[in-house]
Amino acid sequence: DPNADFTAQFRLTGLLPGTQYDVRVEYGASRKRGHKTLDGTFRTAPAADDAKPVTFTVTTGQRYPNRDSDRGFLIYVQMLKLDPDFFVHTGDILYYDQLGKTPALANWHWQRTYSLETLVEFHRNVASYFMKDDHETLQDDAWPTMETEFMGDMTFADGLRIFLDQVPMGDKTYRTVRWGKDLQVWLVEGRDYRSANTMEDGPDKTIWGAEQMAWFKRTVQESDASFRILISPTPVVGPDRVNKRDNHSNAAFAHEGNLLREFIASQDNMVVVCGDRHWQYVSVDQTHGVREYSSGPATDRHAGGWSNDKRMPEHQYLNVIGGFLAVTVERDDGLPVLIARHYGVDGNILNEDRIAAE
């Protein structure tokens, strides 16, 4: 589609659960001239009554100038070695702030990032879900009614449209997916429906919007998965820097944040995975007991904004470093367990956290 940066999307239907599929994409001016092929593979989710082990990986903070390999980003090489069932990018996939001042330049950011060898090789072999945050929507801490001259000709509406052009998506940018008997994940939208960060906090201030919040609570309560995981572009638990006012762990959104943490705490075997923060952590909310895993940024060069000696009561693990998070849900002596492992960019395990289903 020339109006969508020459991207093409099509829906696959009738796929069987728990099945490995091979894909061949053919492209070129014609079959006789410039014809090329690209092969890939992916696995579909197991059926809801299948207790098959599932592993997925997560990252955030993928800024092009901070890549750590001539071929792109090292984490994609290491994640591929784990042969994950699926991958989630929680947002900050790329950064419009400095160089994406027009829609054409924003599209160019997608083109150059997803032409990197490590990303092409990884995504040819792993099913992926993409979420957006502020930097691939417009700029740092963006909201729909933000007025800014900083981004030139680029607008919030442009960011929403370009994101949907560049990544595969269903009917909404918030959705839930069941991966077998023991896992269901919720991927939420944190930019489209939010109030201005500068608005006074209270019952009317929101990040998710009323419709998404109602959907989230309803679908979580309907789920009988052994483990339920909220995957959020931004923190729900934190802790975060005191001057931040963009997420549910900040005082600026304390009302909705408290309601969300209270709801999650009322659910058995539910945890949070988040992106956005430039450091890895495992934290437990001191009021409600909600557990949160921050994936940390894609590279060591991107890590920062906190220090390893600033350990708070919430922290079970803290490391200002790049890498990724891998989550496995499997059975141990017939009982469901969740294992969350933080990795460095070199593929070394930095921390392991294990939870048995209650």
Q: What function would you assign to each model-found segment?
A:
Residues D1-E358:
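Metal-dependent phosphoester/phosphodiester hydrolase catalytic core
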